[in-house]
């Protein structure tokens, strides 16, 4: 929509990079980066992150509330078991090197009341948490952007997947053994427990199944790519590319064995979407049954094993 920006000029207020999260109380939060369309890099007062809330499964939404002010991209929401909320985002040009290759980093704001209020204060600098130092032609800058963060199972802390633009685009992984990060200065690198530029890729998303397997999605050679990792998100297997091409995919964990992956073909427009099922060992369920043609003994058995292929010889075993 039309605005008069902070420099007194006519401009357009626009949005990008929406992320959503269903809270433990059932509320849905949606956040998006916002900015003035023209000259946004020099208009931090007109940029920020806006949040909307739905309490009726997305039927209606609250008015937008700005929770952060400043130039940013790709906000990402995480809820901890305590109810604390993290909103991570790509922080732009804190060291003033815009135009010299890339100068970003991941920052965050935090809410302790379900997203009603956030800290640091609205117009204050955010918490800097994920940053890699780079140097090129005598110029020093920082990177780690497009964050996706999970709380690892069994209280093993946090794992983050980020994109690093350093002589090409790479996937980097950062870790904390607690449910928090060390807060850094704008010109400080961290965390110490990081595996930078692990392999080529862009735009990562990270998830974990209850059984421990982590899943990483990212873009590689214009294709949506998935890798299965271990319970610590430190070791990943072979790449799997299920879609025909496109950019800027994501993933969402649906249940104990299922995730949904999405990818968009930016030039053509359509969104590609598929459901992926985790294939791993399933413990057989033991039941005492009465042979009477009634399956009531299996009513509470969720695990099913499909046997067969594209033929008439198929069956589902429980």
Predicted regions and their residues:
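Order/disorder boundary and secretion-linked terminal/linker segments
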Residues: 281-318
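Asp-box/BNR beta-propeller blade signature and adjacent active/binding-site loops
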Residues: 1-281
